[in-house]
Amino acid sequence: LGYFHHLVLPPFYYKNPSVNGLVNNYSEIINRIDNKHLKIYLYNFPQLSGIQLGVDLVEILSEKFPKNIVGYKDSSGDWDNTSQIMEKCPQINMFPGSEIFLSKALEKGAAGVITGTGNVNPGMVKQTYEAFYNDKKKSIILQKKIDDFRTAVQKYPLISALKGLIEYYRKDEGWQYLRPPLTALPKADLKNLIQSIDPLEFSLKS
């Protein structure tokens, strides 16, 4: 299909793999695909995978496959990990998994963010990114807004909250139907969430 950029989780059925085991796993993926255009973004999400993709692994893989291992999405929420990888592997395109880290990550050379809440608040996240380079005073104001938005949303189960917001603002009840085991956000919680974020003047549009 022509898609060469891939966000790749570690294999997480067996827990506590060694660094060498993870190196072998990603090496197998790259060697078997055997395509010079392949670009892999390591996906660190230990809360779900149970595996931390640490700086030692990133250093080894980026040295072994400099043209294939090109980025890292850090959904751990651990700023120390994000910062350490940017310092030790500056050639890696870093994408924190929360917009709360956007401005300070850009300060250290990050490429941007890949954030779930960006699905419902894309415009403000984009504006914050652009203002960082063009209008620092504006970027500070916008960063506070996206911080407040994220903080409000993550008080609830994330997917349920995001789909509830899309249902409400698009007036489309189809968004309240989630695949099990996920469930729709209770109406009272959705009402409270809307009251929290309405003053932030966000938009579903990018």
Where are these regions (language model features)?
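Short, electropositive alpha-helical surface patch
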Residues: L1-F4, V58-K64, Y169-D172
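Active-site beta->alpha loop and helix N-cap motifs at the rims of alpha/beta catalytic domains
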Residues: L1-Q52
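Flexible, active-site-adjacent loop/turn segments at secondary-structure boundaries
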Residues: F12, G77, K104, Q176, ...
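Charge-dense, low-complexity intrinsically disordered segments
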Residues: N16, T115, A184-K187
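Soluble or luminal CAZymes and related metallo-dependent hydrolases
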Residues: G21, G77, D189
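Catalytic alpha/beta core domains of metabolic enzymes, predominantly
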Residues: R32-L38, F45-Y156
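C-terminal alpha-helical cap/extension of soluble enzyme domains
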Residues: A110, N121-S206
